[in-house]
Amino acid sequence: MTAPLPPIAAIATAPGRGGIGVVRVSGPDVRPVMHAICGQALKPRHATYLPFLDGHGKVIDHGLALYFPGPNSYTGEEVLELQGHGGPVVMQMLLTRCLQAGHGIGLRLAEPGEFTRRAFLNDKLDLAQAEAVADLIEASTEAAARSAARSMEGEFSHAIHTLVEKVIHLRMLVEATLDFPEEEIDFLEASDARGQLATIRNDLGNVLAQARQGALLREGLSVVLAGQPNVGKSSLLNALAGAELAIVTPIAGTTRDRVKETIQIEGIPLHIIDTAGLRDEATDEVERIGIERTWDAIRRADIVLHLVDATDYLRHGLSEIDDAIDDRLSGQLPPGAPIVRVVNKIDVAPTVGGMMFSGNRPHVVAANGPNPTEIWISARTGSGIELLRKELLRLVGWQSGNEGTFLARERHLTALRQAQSHLDVAAEQSERQAQALDLFAEELRLAQEHLNSITGEFTSDDLLGTIFTRFCIGK
């Protein structure tokens, strides 16, 4: 039997001034703190308005006090919450008073995420739900918040548990066949083990697809605007953002450093990075540094929009400089990151080379082999901008109207991919003779381990520490 953890306390609301602030205390027995500060016993799960008292009986503040006996609380322990006025000085005075009153029972300041970690350790929520708490707090879009709420309610965990149950059932059949090889009944054949495995793999693929969508909502995409000077990169940033964020002038090289703005497209955060124009020779040291930073941003990009001038492109095709930029982009981008060629300023090139663009009829040329997708736009008039937004979503595989998405992290995607890989190997083993059954069983076991790591049923202490230290202190 493990010893109970020491009681902890922290300010649970965000730093700064506010109408209300909350100090939270959790532990095996918080009643000494309750009696010292509230001066009375509190009725469980009822808000009581009263004065909060210091060590000399003087009033620190008036507010609401709530007492939650364990295990029916957020952490599974006894919890005391003191809700007062949200000034930082008042909150600090109240927290200090809690620590003084709880000195005799070992009360200490909580570490980041420790309240939620205790909820996990006391089986109030699993690891995926615990992470969803932090994701809900940090959500930058409404879609991300709704998806985090679904994960917090257990939708993601339920999907994982369902997969694990199916894997366990299949493992049981394989183990029975291994343990009783002399039996006339072929457990695997009789129960359609291959069909069960195919179902599991299909279900896992669906969960992984949803998790990828959720990861997009959580992390967003880094989209870099690149190209020669004065091709309209800053104008495109302004058009995508719907605001004048970057300075736009006819003078080439106006943008000397990166300008970053986060926008939303169907709830996905897009981190748009406007960069210094790329050319063979920088005119000065400032521009040279700006160009270096442009390539640095490109190396970390999810998507690069390579802007070219419509008039020049229609008259002469891709210039040597733009061709060189394309070649270097291909070598500098992360594997799999797409390049979109954005042909800008079609409003000032309505009839060139026999091709006409009315200004409201942009078109897309789909990617073909090494050639990037082309989208024709006018950042100044807005023509083609909506088409560009849709193309960005298509490139990352976003499915519009996906209300069932749950939020996922990179570690979840990694675990799902690893489980998928083991199930793929298991499928290969199932096609072989009986001597491969032990390998089949081992691949199923490894797949189950990776799935269990998502909900925390098989997770190292080091990983738990990494996850919970990223929370705010009062959570």
Curated annotation (Swiss-Prot):
Localisation: Cytoplasm
Record keywords, A-Z: Cytoplasm, GTP-binding, Hydrolase, Magnesium, Metal-binding, Nucleotide-binding, Potassium, tRNA processing
UniProt-listed GO biological process terms: tRNA methylation; tRNA wobble uridine modification
Chain residues that bind (6S)-5-formyl-5,6,7,8-tetrahydrofolate: 24, 81, 124, 475
Record InterPro entries: G_TrmE, GTP-bd, GTP-bd_TrmE_N, GTPase_MnmE, MnmE_dom2, MnmE_helical, P-loop_NTPase, Small_GTP-bd
Top-level EC class as recorded in UniProt: hydrolase
EC number: 3.6.-.-
HAMAP family listed in its UniProt record: GTPase_MnmE
Protein name per UniProt: tRNA modification GTPase MnmE
Annotated organism of origin: Cupriavidus pinatubonensis (strain JMP 134 / LMG 1197)
Gene name as annotated: mnmE
